[in-house]
Structure formats: structure tokens, C-alpha cells
UniProtKB/Swiss-Prot annotation:
It holds the Pfam family Ribosomal_L5. Keywords: Ribonucleoprotein, Ribosomal protein, RNA-binding, rRNA-binding, tRNA-binding. The lineage of its organism: Bacteria, Bacillati, Bacillota, Bacilli, Bacillales. Belongs to the universal ribosomal protein uL5 family. This is Large ribosomal subunit protein uL5. It comes from Bacillus cytotoxicus (strain DSM 22905 / CIP 110041 / 391-98 / NVH 391-98).
Length: 179
């Protein structure tokens, strides 16, 4: 069993039960899924760029991403509907906990001038979105093999009803929020 999952069941659940006065264990918010999205703008001119992004995302997440396509044509960006423009991967269960553990303990501390993640990135429904400026913070990415520095969005979807509950949940999991 994963370290974080065990911590959730043994420590976090009772702590949240007492803090928010839940009547049932099923009311306690939990992390439902983590979605990692990489937008590759250069894929319009250069289809090789997308292959590299997919390869890197596979290494980071540990599973094969799905290629996202343009919903609309935008003439200004020379974009046609249906063109591949990015990749995303949805993690659930064991892999989700593995990735979150790695993100909090290894990757985020490797960010330059890191002072904690923003408290304002909640969406009002208990989900948290985190933007990463470069993929090099992940230990799986080999610095020498990187063709281009790419950012990504990491969305942590929780079952919490309010931002306050979600913030408390992520703080208990060890998410380093700004003071």
C-alpha cells in the first residue's frame, strides 16, 4: 500500500473528521484524480515536438498520455480543427498517490526560488490547479535529452465541496502552500 494512502486512512481522515465535524467517514474529502496537461503550441508547424512531449509525459506520469486535438480552427494561429496540439494524462488510484508523493517531496523543492505554491489556485469547487514552468523538475527527465523546456498544468481534483476543505486536505498531504 502506498505511503500517502496509508497516511490518508490512518491520520488525515480522523483529523479532517474532527476539524469539519463530519458525521460519516464517507464525507471526508479525498483526492479523486490528478490530470497532467501539456500544451504544445509548436505542434502546428513541427509534429516532432508533440512526440517529444508525449515521451516526456509518459516518463513523468508512468502511463501513456492521450493526444488532445484542437476544438476550433483559429486562423491567427494557423490552426485547423482536429489538429493535435497537446497531450494529457489522468492518474487515479495507486499511480495518483505515487505521482503526488513524488511531486510534493522531490519535484516542487527542485523549483528555483521556491517559496511554496499559491493558495489562490483553487477553483471554488475544491479543485487545485498548479502550473509548472519546466519539466526538468521531475527526476525522470534527463537534462541532456531535453529538446525544449516545456511547462505543464497539474490539476488535482478532490471530492471536497469547498476550497477550505480542499486546502486542508492538501496541507495534510504535505502540499507546501505559501505562508
Amino acid at each position: 500500500m502506498n505511503r500517502l494512502k496509508e497516511k490518508f486512512q490512518k491520520e488525515i481522515t480522523p483529523a479532517l473528521m474532527s476539524k469539519f465535524n463530519y458525521k460519516s467517514v464517507m464525507q471526508v474529502p479525498k483526492i479523486e484524480k490528478i490530470v497532467i496537461n501539456v500544451g504544445v503550441g509548436d505542434a502546428v508547424q513541427n509534429s516532432k515536438a508533440l512526440d517529444n512531449a508525449v515521451e516526456e509525459l509518459t516518463q513523468i506520469a508512468g502511463q501513456k498520455p492521450v493526444i488532445t486535438r484542437a476544438k476550433k480552427s483559429i486562423a491567427g494561429f494557423r490552426l485547423r480543427e482536429g489538429m493535435p496540439i497537446g497531450a494529457k494524462v489522468t492518474l487515479r488510484g495507486e499511480q495518483m498517490y505515487e505521482f503526488f508523493d513524488k511531486l510534493v517531496t522531490v519535484s516542487l523543492p527542485r523549483v528555483r526560488d521556491f517559496r511554496g505554491v499559491s493558495k489562490k489556485s483553487f477553483d471554488g469547487r475544491g479543485n487545485y490547479t498548479l502550473g509548472v514552468k519546466e519539466q526538468l523538475i521531475f527526476p525522470e527527465i534527463d537534462y541532456d535529452k531535453v529538446s525544449k523546456v516545456r511547462g505543464m498544468d497539474i490539476v488535482i481534483v478532490t471530492t471536497a465541496n469547498t476550497d477550505e476543505e480542499a486546502r486542508e486536505l492538501l496541507t495534510q498531504f504535505g502540499m507546501p502552500f505559501q505562508k
